[in-house]
Amino acid sequence: MKALIIDCLASGDGKRILARDVIGAGPRTVKGILQSEGIEAKITPVEDLDIKDIKKYNLIFISAMTSDFKCVKKLVERIRLKTDSKIIVGGPIANDINILEKIEADISIVGEGEITIRELIKKDFDAEDVKGTTYWDYNEDELKINPLREILTDLKLITPSTEIKDYKNYFSARVYVEVVRGCSNFKRPLLLCTNKKCNLCENGTLKCPLNINPGCGFCSVPSVFGYARSRDEEDILKEVEALLKEGVNRIVLSAPDFLDYKRGEKLINPYFPEPNYEAIESLLSKCKDLADKYNANVLIENIKANLFNEKVAEIFSKYLKTPIYIGCESGDKNHCKLLGRPTTPDDVLKAVKIAKKYNLKAQVYFIYGLPGENEETAKNTVNFMHKIKNYIDKITVYKFRPLPMSAFQNFKPNITKYSLLIRETANKINLEIKKKYIGRVLEVIISERHFRNKRDAIGYLPDSGLMVVVKDGAKFIGKTKKVKIIKAYEKYLEGRILKTWLCKY
């Protein structure tokens, strides 16, 4: 039996525009499960798929996000014209339990796949009575929805493949290694509570009398993946080293909140206990040793501002040269409470000031068009962006999307002129920050040809996700070069490769 895993993550309408340097953990995890059960498997990004090769495979897995719906729908239609192989859809797109009524696949895997896929293999992919799946019953011509599966407690079952060369850009990509699964924020968005008040889940609770899904209202992680739990250090290090041996240059230690790592058992309290400093330092120090050994970089991603303090910053500054990503979402304190946020804008301001003190580059996330957003909250968010801009390296803004299994799944984006003001302010601040790079010489991993000008190339900084358009750089794909920055834009930089003789000075 042979399986093809098609990576559609962040492909939107069919072509990945943003985050082209990201290789998520999901498809590798699926490949590892299949290989552990004796099934030959290959990953292909959707852009690299040769549809004629589909006939070679008995099983077609598709990994996608909710925003990739159009891409997946068109892809499945193309596959159906070529083969009758079983099509299984997974990833966040499958959190919509009715997805098979919209996409002509056979099975969807809702949530974690480690046990579900193994059960499907044992049953020759007959999904009847397999928890965590929906499937199309062709005899009755209807969608069947099985009960959700309990969250995975044995994280030893997470066995990702490290055969990373399925991805052509593995050498320049940020390759995600799962460290923590699930989230510790089991508060509820007060926007959905009667009188906008509740004293039951101030610090998080597993059960809600109103059956409101846990976590920030816009996020589905607690509902899908449960409370935060951590992989063993030895398993993480084994995976990291195997990827570095394959030639990966940038590893991201992936977690909804890295500071939840080994913080406790069954974490549903985003405030207590405090971070496990010893475990964090042990993991980062050993990852840094591996990165130094293979001349690579190890990055972390998300952290909660309320858990970030000087002790954490001191540890990070010893082992990391990379940005840290902090969610703020709204610059209005009351709005944050309504959203179910564990942190306030004051927490974020304190965190970015600490980061600056320890020479850590902070990047802060915001969302516009959120439920509860109004003129006052939007203006407070804009003012807060200006308050933090001197302490940060970037602002990232997203448009609110209602995600299946999130508390706000039935809301629609509330886009007003004040919402757009949030986006416009972020763009202006980002341009202002990026202009500071003009004239600097930076090391850039040159990844691929530019979409329009084939003589130019797209590259990335080794220690971040910052994109650089390298003029006349196409002949250096796969190499790391010193690039002098000559222009700055809202989302990327532009530069030229230094002449070899200049690199000495």
Swiss-Prot record:
Keywords in alphabetical order: 4Fe-4S, Iron, Iron-sulfur, Metal-binding, S-adenosyl-L-methionine
GO MF: 4 iron, 4 sulfur cluster binding; catalytic activity; cobalamin binding; metal ion binding
Residue ranges constituting the TRAM domain according to the UniProt record: 435-499
Sequence positions that bind [4Fe-4S] cluster: C208, C216, C219
Location of the Radical SAM core domain: 193-440
Cofactor: [4Fe-4S] cluster
InterPro entries: Cobalamin-bd, Elp3/MiaA/NifB-like_rSAM, rSAM, rSAM_horseshoe, Tetrapyrrole_Bchl_Biosynth_MTs, TRAM_dom
SUPFAM superfamilies: Radical SAM enzymes (SSF102114)
Leader peptide range in chain numbering: none
PANTHER family: ANAEROBIC MAGNESIUM-PROTOPORPHYRIN IX MONOMETHYL ESTER CYCLASE-RELATED, METHYLTHIOTRANSFERASE MJ0865-RELATED
Name used for this protein in its record: Uncharacterized protein MJ1620
